[in-house]
Amino acid sequence: MSYFKIKSHAKINLALNVLSKSHSLHKIESIISFLDLHDEILIKKIDDKNHKIRFIGKFSNGIKSRNTVSLLLKIIDKKKLLKNKYKIIIKKNITTEAGLGGGSMNAANILNFLIKKKLIMIKKKEILEISNSCLLYTSDAADE
C-alpha cells in the first residue's frame, strides 16, 4: 500500500482572548489564519501491533516520543476506535515551539484524515481530550 500525503499548515493567532482556566487547560477564543508554511505527513496502514511515528526534516530534532501525534494515537487505541495500525512520517518544515501550531495541526490533520476516510468515528467531546486545535480542524466529527 502506498502512502497518503497530507499537508499540515501552520497557523498564527491574530487575536487571542483567554476566557477561563480549568485544570491545566485554558478556554480561549481566537482569530487565526493559516499560512503557506506546512509540514508534510505521509500515512499508510501497516501490518503491525503498534503504530510507527517518525519525524524527519530540519525541525525534527528534539521532538520527544511523547508528543501530540503519539497522544492522539494513544487515546484512539485506548478507546478502540481504530482497527488497524499506521506508519506516519512527518517532515517538519514548521519550527517547534514557535506558536505556529505545528504539533497540534499535525494531530488535527491526521485525525481529520481518519475521519474523512471513515476509518474512525469520534465525538467532538473526545477530540477535546487531545487538543482544542484538533477540534478546530476536524469539522466532520460527530456532535454527540
Segments from the language model and where they lie:
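Conserved small/polar residues in nucleotide/adenosyl-binding loops
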Residues: Y137-A142
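Acidic, glycine-rich active-site loops and adjacent beta-strand->loop/helix elements
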Residues: K92-I94, S133-L136
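ATP-binding N-lobe of GHMP and related small-molecule kinases
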Residues: M1-A98, I115-I122
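DPxDG-like acidic metal-binding loop motif
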Residues: A98-I127, S131
